[in-house]
């Protein structure tokens, strides 16, 4: 149910708010890459989750632009 809740939350936001969330996720993804490079990252599944959330936000932004 978590995914449906986040989708409803994303769809309820404006495009500017979605852009801010996207920037936060991109920063998180960068941080994860740095942690992986230094060997500090133990939860590799967070990459996939962050990338999918970014893709979801991009999809919703493109839907709202139409």
Swiss-Prot record:
Gene Ontology BP, a term: translation
Keyword set includes Ribosomal protein: yes
Keyword terms, alphabetized: Ribonucleoprotein, Ribosomal protein
A Gene Ontology cellular-component term: cytosolic large ribosomal subunit
Record-level Gene Ontology MF annotations: structural constituent of ribosome
InterPro entries given in the database record: Ribosomal_protein_uL29, Ribosomal_uL29, Ribosomal_uL29_CS, Ribosomal_uL29_sf
Cross-referenced Pfam families: Ribosomal_L29 (PF00831)
Family per record: Belongs to the universal ribosomal protein uL29 family.
Listed name of the protein: Large ribosomal subunit protein uL29
Organism: Francisella tularensis subsp. holarctica (strain LVS)
Gene name per UniProt: rpmC
């Amino acid at each position: 149910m978590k995914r449906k809740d986040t989708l409803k939350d994303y769809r309820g936001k404006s495009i500017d708010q979605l852009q801010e969330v996207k920037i936060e996720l991109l920063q998180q993804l960068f941080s994860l890459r740095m942690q992986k490079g230094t060997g500090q990252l133990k939860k590799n599944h967070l990459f996939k989750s962050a990338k999918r959330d970014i893709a979801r936000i991009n999809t919703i932004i493109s839907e709202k632009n139409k």
